[in-house]
């Protein structure tokens, strides 16, 4: 992309646990050295499956991991869709302008288990913590924001849900019947 003079930017996503893998460091270092137009987006829900972040890294933030590669790192409230959009938009513009990559750490929360194969989050997270994060649910926050701006209502939501019900059922059926 950079070599061709395009303003395209590569996006890569990983979780907090992924930042402790060698491939992650190699990718950030390579991109930093060659000023590759790339965004490294890290979804930090505080756990690598069930291992707390404090038990997997000494870094105070995951955004700091970019510093050694000469890459700017920024932390954003991953539960705020508008904040994530703004930070991503600015980082994309930075990378597209030839300034090199950016690492974005989104502070977020995983409500359910990491996998469906026996991961029980109640073993490592408290009910109080879950309830606290529920108050910051991005869907509820966006609904409230749009409602306050007069752009959304319960009637609009109900109509949309009714409109897409069959489409969602069809997608689920296709996924259930998909050969892997």
Please provide the spans of the model-predicted regions.
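Glycine-rich ThDP/TPP pyrophosphate-binding loop and its adjacent helix/strand module
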Residues: 1-177
């Amino acid at each position: 992309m950079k070599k061709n003079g395009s303003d395209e930017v590569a996006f890569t996503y990983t979780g907090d646990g992924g930042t402790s893998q060698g491939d992650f460091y190699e990718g950030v270092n390579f991109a930093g050295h060659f000023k590759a137009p790339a965004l490294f987006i890290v979804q930090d829900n505080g756990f690598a499956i069930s291992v707390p972040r404090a038990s997997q890294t000494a870094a105070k933030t995951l955004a700091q991991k970019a510093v050694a590669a000469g890459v700017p790192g920024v932390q954003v409230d991953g539960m705020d869709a508008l904040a994530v959009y703004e930070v991503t938009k600015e980082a994309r513009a930075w990378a597209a302008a030839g300034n090199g990559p950016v690492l974005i750490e989104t502070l977020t929360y995983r409500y359910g288990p990491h996998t469906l194969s026996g991961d029980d989050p109640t073993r490592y997270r408290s009910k109080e913590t879950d309830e606290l994060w529920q108050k910051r649910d991005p869907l509820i926050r966006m609904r409230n924001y749009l409602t306050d701006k007069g752009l959304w209502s319960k009637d609009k939501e109900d109509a949309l849900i009714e409109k897409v019900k069959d489409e969602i059922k069809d997608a689920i059926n296709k996924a259930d019947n998909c050969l892997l």
